[in-house]
Amino acid sequence: MSYRKLGRTSSQRKALLRDLVTDLIINERIETTEARAKELRSVVEKMITLGKRGDLHARRQAAAFVRKEVANTETGQDAIQKLFSDIAPRYQDRQGGYTRIMKLGPRRGDGAPMVIIELV
């Protein structure tokens, strides 16, 4: 099994990916480092596939990973509801490839390659 360690322990890495997945679902576009974005891509694709399945078990699997944050303050919609009601129906006819990674250039402080990852 191949994955990036991202300079963190196992639990820290899982927490980072949970936060990034939740942010990407809520904002649909985030700026991060290239290594994080490439690792995030596979997790987000799996979450959207769960959303497309749409049954109770898929909803519970996604809820176990995605943080319980409010996505829309006016409607009170959280990240899971947005994933299943807004994002998943958008990709019903698409088999994978739900994200796009666009390179930005190096970060000013340490020169890390920065990218924008967004939902297509």
Swiss-Prot record:
One of its GO terms (biological process) is translation. InterPro entries: Ribosomal_bL17, Ribosomal_bL17_CS, Ribosomal_bL17_sf. One of its GO terms (molecular function) is structural constituent of ribosome. The keyword Transferase does not apply. Keywords: Ribonucleoprotein, Ribosomal protein. It comes from the Bacteria. GO terms for cellular component: cytosolic large ribosomal subunit. NCBIfam families: L17 (TIGR00059). Belongs to the bacterial ribosomal protein bL17 family. Part of the 50S ribosomal subunit. Contacts protein L32. This is Large ribosomal subunit protein bL17. The gene is rplQ.
